[in-house]
From Swiss-Prot:
GO terms for molecular function: RNA binding; rRNA binding; structural constituent of ribosome; transferase activity. Residues 210-220, 259-276 have a biased composition (Basic residues). Pfam families: Ribosomal_L2, Ribosomal_L2_C. One of the primary rRNA binding proteins. Required for association of the 30S and 50S subunits to form the 70S ribosome, for tRNA binding and peptide bond formation. It has been suggested to have peptidyltransferase activity; this is somewhat controversial. Makes several contacts with the 16S rRNA in the 70S ribosome. Residues 23-42 have a biased composition (Basic and acidic residues). InterPro entries: NA-bd_OB-fold, Rib_uL2_dom2, Ribosomal_uL2, Ribosomal_uL2_bac/org-type, Ribosomal_uL2_C, Ribosomal_uL2_CS, Ribosomal_uL2_dom3, Ribosomal_uL2_RNA-bd_dom. It comes from the Bacteria. This is Large ribosomal subunit protein uL2. Residues 1-55, 210-276 are annotated as: Disordered. It comes from Synechocystis sp. (strain ATCC 27184 / PCC 6803 / Kazusa). The keyword rRNA-binding applies.
Amino acid sequence: MGIRNYRPMTPGTRQASVSDFTEITKSKPEKSLTTNRHDQKGRNNRGVITSRHRGGGHKKLYRIIDFKRNKQNIPARVAAIEYDPNRNARIALLFYTDGEKRYILAPAGLQVGMTVIAGEEAPFEIGNTLPLSRIPLGSEIHNVELVAGRGGQMVRSAGAFAQVVAKEGDYVTIKLPSKEVRMVRKECVATLGRVSNAEFRNLKLGKAGRKRHLGRRPHVRGSVMNPCDHPHGGGEGRAPIGRSGPVSPWGKPALGAKTRNKKKRSSALIVRRRTK
């Protein structure tokens, strides 16, 4: 992927940049692997806002991604690298030798015509999926399972990768992109390589309209609201928040307060907590 910077012809294009999409080989998605998905707009089943600043944006078809990679020992040819509007990584269309088609997250370096496979005896190559117990120390991996058979839940965003740092007993220790070090069962699977589209982090939207196009609404500061809308609101002019520390709209400590439940069972598997 490359980044194309706009010339400063207008205020909106002055700082804007876009992907050049040179790695994309197919423009329309595989119809059998897409589905309509109702846009929640940040609401739950009762219509109550549970995730603020969401709504609008362009309509999208959801691409059904194979995060489980449970088609064991059957080779698949990479037929295309595609754009997915639902995530910042690219996706790869696979044609299996038995005729089935599936989408997977495209690792960096995966190209059309290459062959990938999942299984315990899969070769050590980019795009192949193996149990963590079979992956050498120091290897870069992504799409990592937390529970065997549930499918990859960690390390799925553009450019992300984890590293295998140790193996002991029934657990494999991995270092996550957040610098957290945690143990995972050795039966859990992961895919070799790092996720594609690593330069996504360098894109600049340039104007608010592109953010709205992505389905993100304005993030309004609490200090400019009324006191009925936010604990930071009210006062004459630019008043201080009037509390010992910043809080959320519902009065909970914000901006740095630890929110993880101390009684979580998985805390025993975290060797080193993530850094800020």
